[in-house]
């Protein structure tokens, strides 16, 4: 005989699901009268990775910029940890950006500062750490991305892949709950893309943050995604688990998958991120 569940156990079973950390609901935005995103909805639960896929110009990066508060939607709701951000002032968004950060395509590193000083910059801006604590955290972050050998060099001497790894370290200095990545594999070869994917996945598992990754690289997305949002002509053609996306018979999705140039993991080898892209 099985024991009957207690009232407490039943309450836990029937409880409302956890509120998504990101809730992007019926969002539309147009530039100069041209629709960029139309009625797009998705959500991400804490600890998940969402990959936003689609061809160039479909509004993938625009979605990230709205999550950061750099752009305001014309219609719809954007909530981060239950807080509506579309009506916040710039001061209110600065508070939100302590919990959500973005790794830009170009890395947005300071060319005049060494790798160490780039990573230290946001830590010093916090204002609650002494210099010894700053340097301890810098060493830890640089170690997490495997950049110990380039701490004293300027970003201009780094490969594209190494710049992106350093940019990730700097983004993590804010101890964010959500990390947004804008096309992290653009202008890198498949080997470096693989290692960037491994790095992002390893950091997520170690630190537990939520990730949203914009990419057109399906092989990269397969390594990372719990959820997929596929955009076509500014509309959400698919939102759901990776497995469902791969099995979809939607003609636009099948065309996207057919056009993607796959490189099998077995072909990539084990080249480190120090390889110049």
Which residues does each PLM region occupy?
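Conserved ABC ATPase "signature" region
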Residues: 83-84, 131-149
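Conserved catalytic motifs of ABC-family nucleotide-binding domains
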Residues: 175
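Conserved ABC ATPase signature
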Residues: 154-158, 162
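Short coil-to-helix segment of the ABC ATPase nucleotide-binding domain corresponding to the Q-loop/switch region
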Residues: 113-121
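Helix-to-loop junction immediately C-terminal to a conserved catalytic motif
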Residues: 68
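Catalytic Walker B motif of ABC-type/P-loop ATPase nucleotide-binding domains
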Residues: 179-182
